[in-house]
Amino acid sequence: VFGASDENGNDIHLKKDDTLDEESYKIDIAENIVISAADDLGFVYALLKISEKYLDIKPFWFWFDQKIEKKDSVKIEKCEINSPKPKVKYRGWFFNDEVLMMKWKINGDKKEPWRMAFETLLRCGGNMTIPGTDKNSRLNRQMAADMGLWITHHHAEPLGAEIFARAYPGVEANFMEKSELFYKLWEDAVIEQKDCNVVWNLCFRGQGDCPFWSNDTSGQFDTPQKRGKLISNIIKKQCDIVKKYVKNPVFCTNLYGEIMELYKDGYIEIDDGIIKVKADNGYGKMVTRRRDNHTARVSSMPVKDGGRQGIYYHVSFYDLQAAN
């Protein structure tokens, strides 16, 4: 029994056990409840397991308007509960095009909807999030990290940095002429996040989620070879910037849209240690999404592709033709 009743109740003890795998837990229920875990997320998952199994709090309780009844006590049989082993190391949600979240307040608190979203992710066994797009990602980043989540970034936001056009208003986003300004943006972003758990997104795309050559007026990137070479060199530079501040960093790159097309044709070089994240087209088909009048439909499934792999699967996006 545990609760606020007059019955003799259990205490919940937390026991750090370095022999357990990361994020795993063991719950021993006897005279007391002993939760063993190797790290913070292991303890979080265990407490949420108790919440669901014995207090009947559903993972989506907030979003489903679950009516929660107060209980004086809960009786639990003696048992042992061991955590399931996740098949994917980094698992999470990307909160994108989040217009319905941006002005929502709960009891006057703009942070509470995001807090509930991150809690739900944890209750579902997730451990990573892109905590919004553009400004929202930076507003919500620390809260997500404080709740134990890994942070990663929008595929058009290298290392989670500020958008060039906002950081340098009136300055053309021309990498060949303004490379030092880009480097400063990226370095500032790394310094800002270096104390969080981050899967660092490596990329170079244009302003506002488009190919970088759409914003470039130099005329130097008129072939896929030139475009791929620049992106490859920038990815290496971004890795070097992160390694200045972070020990054993985790890297990913999103092979999305025009980036997948260049990669498939062999124009972009990516080290095997970088997680290559492949995307569906918005309809569940693993091909590149359509944009404007461009319908390449390049397969995004790995073919003899070495190294670490990931998937970016859309739930409420239907490509950039239907979206228009």
Indicate residue ranges for each PLM-predicted region.
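Hydrophobic faces of well-ordered beta-strands that scaffold small-molecule active sites
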Residues: R91-F95, L122, M128-P131, I151-H154, ...
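An acidic-aromatic substrate-binding cleft motif
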Residues: K58-M128, G307-G310
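Hydrophobic or amphipathic alpha-helical targeting/insertion segments
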Residues: E31-D65, N136-A161, A167-E192
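An acidic- and aromatic-residue-enriched active-site/binding cleft used to recognize and process polar
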Residues: A38-D40, E98, G126, T133-N136, ...
